[in-house]
């Protein structure tokens, strides 16, 4: 059985590895074989993955629809996570007003073909709506039985503190991986102290830590990585990209010493932080699934972590611990 982890001080428990479905959007990650990705959903459940993460903005709507169909009769076997808070077809881009959150949640339920959502997240902070209003809407959805838990995504410590005055988020979902360690400064310690689960997205560095890229890799039109920016970090700008690839090659050699892949090293590194409830990975097919699942039982030693940091230092690759969070 795969390792199970609790979300902070709540009763929400899931597999340590989660199935991320941004790639299922069919619009933001280049071509994807929808049938193969759908088949991977059932295979993931068989492999012990119990958490599936999506959002209405992925596509928009495609990811929720594909996941809902793929889960089928196995819905009760999983922890289903989705997100609202974007006006995907208009401006302003973010909307966490009470009216919007309630209405969009109904749409999520329909697309996912379910009567309840295990964890509903506010996708990005809405700087124009009081958090008290948003939290009130989430509390009402919970009371109505339409969601079991609620949380936030991409929120700072100050934002979480304000939310805590009006309820208790079960989780904060933010990017965290070897090339982006911004959350180590404040957010991860806060979540650990306050009993809030932490969901790490981008565990594989949006592909940088898979070993699949080369200096000649280009991203097709419509793939968000083609813009160079990754949540306010220049990870996919050519100069940085080439440095990161050199770093990944050395990490690959380090992982091979333990008979592992660089992707497994990346997953094990994220899961090694005590605040992390679940590490999300995008899974396109069953072969990727098998590789990722095999990483969960690997516990990195202090020596392993020191070797990783030494590689970053020698290659001159920043980890952005002190950089500002994207909000």
Where are these predicted regions, by residue range?
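Active-site beta-loop-alpha junctions enriched in small/polar residues
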Residues: 22-24, 55-57, 83-87, 122-125, ...
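Alpha-helix N-cap and loop-to-helix initiation/capping positions
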Residues: 29-36, 62, 66, 93-103, ...
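Conserved, mostly hydrophobic/aromatic
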Residues: 7, 19, 37, 52, ...
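Aromatic-lined glycan-binding groove of carbohydrate-active enzymes
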Residues: 183-226, 261
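Glycine/proline-rich, positively charged
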Residues: 42, 46, 89-182, 186, ...
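Short, well-ordered coil/turn segments that N-cap beta-strands
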Residues: 12-17, 48-51, 74-78, 114-118, ...
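Terminal-tail/helix-coil boundary detector
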Residues: 2, 219-253, 257, 272-277, ...
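N-terminal binding-site loop/beta-alpha segment at the start of enzyme catalytic domains
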Residues: 1-78
């Amino acid at each position: 059985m795969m390792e199970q982890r609790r979300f902070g001080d709540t009763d929400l428990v899931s597999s340590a590895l989660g199935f991320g479905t941004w790639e299922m959007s069919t619009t933001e990650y280049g071509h994807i074989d929808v049938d193969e990705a759908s088949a991977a959903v059932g295979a993931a459940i068989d492999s012990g993955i119990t958490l599936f993460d999506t959002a209405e903005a992925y596509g928009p709507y495609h990811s929720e629809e594909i996941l809902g169909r793929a889960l089928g009769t196995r819905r009760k076997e999983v922890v289903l996570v989705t997100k609202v808070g974007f006006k995907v077809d208009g401006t302003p881009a973010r909307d966490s007003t009470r009216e919007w959150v309630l209405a969009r949640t109904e749409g999520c339920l329909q697309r996912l073909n379910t009567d309840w959502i295990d964890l509903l997240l506010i996708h990005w902070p809405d700087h124009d709506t009081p958090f008290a209003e948003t939290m009130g809407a989430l509390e009402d959805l919970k009371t109505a039985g339409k969601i079991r838990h609620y949380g936030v995504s991409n929120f700072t410590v100050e934002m979480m503190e304000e939310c805590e005055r009006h309820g208790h988020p079960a989780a904060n979902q933010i990017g965290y991986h070897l090339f982006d360690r911004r959350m180590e400064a404040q957010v991860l310690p806060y979540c650990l102290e306050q009993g809030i689960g932490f969901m790490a997205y981008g565990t594989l560095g949006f592909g940088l830590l898979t070993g699949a890229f080369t200096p000649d890799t280009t991203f097709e039109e419509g793939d968000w990585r083609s813009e160079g920016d990754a949540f306010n970090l220049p990870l996919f700008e050519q100069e940085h990209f080439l440095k990161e690839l050199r770093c990944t090659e050395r990490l690959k050699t380090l992982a091979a010493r333990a008979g592992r892949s660089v992707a497994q090293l990346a997953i094990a590194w994220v899961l090694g932080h005590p605040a992390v409830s679940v590490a999300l990975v995008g899974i396109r097919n069953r072969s990727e699934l098998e590789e990722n699942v095999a990483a969960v039982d690997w516990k990195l030693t202090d020596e392993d972590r020191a070797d990783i940091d030494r590689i970053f230092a020698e290659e001159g690759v920043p980890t952005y611990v002190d950089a500002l969070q994207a909000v």
